[in-house]
């Protein structure tokens, strides 16, 4: 089930981003798929927690392939597909390695690895995919707000997930202790 949630969240993020206009909140520009991208880091952490780091890379590879196919079907340009795939590979690998190396509670590993992964995901994709360096959808002046808007949303999602995981783990400890 964890693997399915991980893969479906990636496909859904691509579809939602293509289907809906970005959300504009003041100066911030947030593609609608951003809400699901934050979740992909959490689902990937759950996959890794169950299957281990080595097998998780196999699922990341499958997700990478699936994402490229879906992006191509949706009509994304080659530069967007390339930027998306490179961003995904870097952000997911970084999240995986941080999650693996931290010797903290699961909730804190999810939080910290997800925040770093989210920052990388936001910065790399906006610069390589959306700025004048990429597909030129955003002028350079809008790039910082686009990155920051995505980072804020992804960080909030990571924080909520960390709280839920923390509460769930505390409740299960209490239930076992009773």
Descriptions of predicted regions:
Residues 13-18, 67-74, 125, 129, ...:
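Structural signal for membrane-spanning alpha-helices in multi-pass inner-membrane proteins
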Residues 21-32, 67-87:
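Interfacial aromatic-anchored transmembrane helix boundaries in multi-pass membrane proteins
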Residues 1-54:
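Hydrophobic transmembrane alpha-helices
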Residues 47-53, 57, 72-80:
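Transmembrane alpha-helix/helix-exit interface in multi-pass inner-membrane proteins
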Residues 1-5, 53-63, 105-112:
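Cytoplasmic-side transmembrane-helix entry/capping segments in multi-pass membrane proteins
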Residues 77-178:
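Membrane-embedded alpha-helical hairpins and interfacial helices in multi-pass inner-membrane proteins
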Residues 11, 63-65, 88, 118:
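Residue-level recognition of pore/gate-forming positions within transmembrane alpha-helices
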Residues 43-47, 68-74, 94-98:
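Membrane-helix exit/interface motif
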């Amino acid at each position: 089930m964890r693997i399915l949630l991980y893969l479906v969240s990636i496909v859904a993020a691509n579809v939602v981003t293509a289907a809906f206009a970005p959300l504009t909140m003041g100066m911030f520009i947030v593609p609608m798929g951003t809400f699901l991208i934050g979740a992909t880091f959490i689902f990937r952490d759950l996959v890794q927690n169950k299957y281990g780091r080595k097998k998780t890379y196999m699922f990341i590879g499958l997700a990478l392939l699936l994402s490229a196919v879906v992006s191509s079907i949706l009509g994304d340009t080659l530069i967007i597909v390339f930027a998306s795939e490179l961003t995904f590979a870097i952000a997911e690998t970084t999240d995986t390695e941080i999650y693996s190396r931290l010797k903290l509670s699961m909730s804190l590993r999810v939080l910290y690895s997800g925040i770093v992964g989210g920052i990388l995901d936001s910065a790399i994709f906006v610069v390589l995919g959306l700025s004048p360096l990429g597909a030129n959808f955003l002028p350079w002046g809008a790039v910082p707000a686009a990155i920051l808007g995505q980072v804020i949303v992804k960080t909030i999602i990571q924080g909520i997930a960390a709280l839920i995981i923390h509460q769930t783990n505390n409740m299960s400890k209490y239930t076992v202790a009773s």
